[in-house]
Design a protein with these regions (language model features):
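N-terminal hydrophobic or amphipathic segments with adjacent small-residue motifs
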Residues: 3, 19-20, 78
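Gly/Pro-enriched, hydrophobic low-complexity segments
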Residues: 40-42, 53-56, 64-182
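Gram-negative outer-membrane assembly/targeting C-terminal domains
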Residues: 168-234
Length: 234
């Protein structure tokens, strides 16, 4: 559960009446959501006992038939669980897609799973925490392809009549893949799962910061960025 909380955790601060939202996890956020590599995020042996699974009608995705398995909590725990669907390829029996979100039945548990800290007097009301993970076949294997995380919530101040709606959105797409021996990363250079990327990069808004790295600027749409990267690689 600790990992689940860190996936969607966020911090809030107020500057000049502007609400700033910081998502904890930075570059690691998407990698934690790879449910195949990180079974503890959803599919660990212990977690499976907490859910009720059901076979739904099969569907066709990209001209391939898929088993559809829906799941929802069958027990009540001290923390919020998930509701969603898993799509499994008929022939390969590998994951094609996972759609899941935080169970909002108990808003107190949902807040505990999402929010790390907020300003005094601010009321935080979660509306949705949704994830989408897709996988794509390359050769004889299926690899991670795309990850999206959406957090929708409302905030207002005590003694104020109206609330405001906000959305924190993050996504990752795999543009290219090469297989080569891995080299270890020193602990000093490792990005911790509870760190905030924005706080660690002093020149975050400096145009020269991004240079030629395979990184998408926060103000650029994912689709345009991917097309640009593909043109550069050709």
């Amino acid at each position: 559960y600790e990992m689940s909380a860190s996936l969607v955790g966020s911090e809030m601060c107020i500057r000049d009446s502007t609400l700033a939202v910081k998502v904890v996890g930075g570059p690691n956020l998407s990698l934690y959501l790879d449910i195949v590599k990180n079974g503890d995020a959803l599919l660990s042996t212990d977690n499976l006992d907490y859910y009720e699974f059901r076979m739904e009608d099969p569907v066709n995705l990209d001209n391939r038939m898929q088993y559809v398995v829906s799941f929802r909590p069958r027990v009540s725990l001290m923390y919020a669980l998930f509701i969603g669907k898993l799509y499994i390829d008929y022939e390969r029996l590998s994951f094609t897609r996972a759609e899941f979100g935080l169970d909002m039945a108990n808003r107190v548990k949902a807040v505990e799973a999402i929010l790390h800290k907020k300003p005094v007097g601010l009321r935080f009301r979660p509306q949705e925490v949704a994830y989408l993970v897709t996988y794509k076949q390359q050769g004889t294997k299926t690899y991670l392809n795309y990850i999206r995380n959406v957090i929708r919530f409302k905030c207002d101040w005590k003694k104020r009549l109206f609330s405001s709606s906000y959305t924190a959105f993050s996504e990752m797409v795999v543009t290219d893949r090469t297989e080569s021996p891995l080299s270890g990363i020193s602990n000093k250079n490792t990005f911790k799962r509870k760190q905030v990327f924005y706080d660690l990069v002093d020149e975050y808004w400096n145009e020269d910061f991004w240079r030629n790295y395979n990184i998408i600027e926060p103000t650029e749409s994912l689709e345009n960025a991917v097309n640009k990267l593909r043109k550069q690689s050709n």
